[in-house]
Amino acid sequence: MICNKNEESARIAADFLKCGKICVLPTDTVYGFSGIAENSLQAKFGTDAKIRKIKGREEKKPFIQLVSSPDEISKYSDFKIPEQLAQKWPGALTVIVPLKFPFSEKNATVAFRCPGDLWLRNVIAECGFPIYSTSVNRSGSPVLDSVCKIEKEFSNEVDLIVDDGDKTGSLPSTIVLLKNGGWKVLRQGSVIV
């Protein structure tokens, strides 16, 4: 377990992620299970499947991908984020955009968020790729908001836990689907749009 969010701990967390490990990381909303999300590395390490197994989450429900800067999304999607939404970043706003080739051959979409937490953005930047993030809980159960609860339930199933204190009462991110030049709020969270 890491108890300090600093430059060294960001490097350590990134090293775990780059090796295909699953980490519990604090975000600007709640604690999240995280793993490397870059397509070729994810396939090599199976991070998606590892997180799904821990959570008991069905395969058709995708994970949010966290990016280190809003500009990073242009690597994966040609969709332009409307200025009114872009102004909310970094922060607890998740946008769902279509993926471009070669990341998707079908009309697939992905949910991206640029978190407000600078330490977490440094971890992601150190990885060099987006990372998955999904709330720390078993599917269908309440989100765990304290490291004590997380450690008790998941310490034998994850490779690293970063302690940033309790996240009691934290709201999840707001999720917005972008399409046809407009957007639709799918989940109202801590950011008002």
Regions found by a protein language model. Give the residues of each.
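Active-site-adjacent structural elements in enzyme catalytic cores
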Residues: 1-193
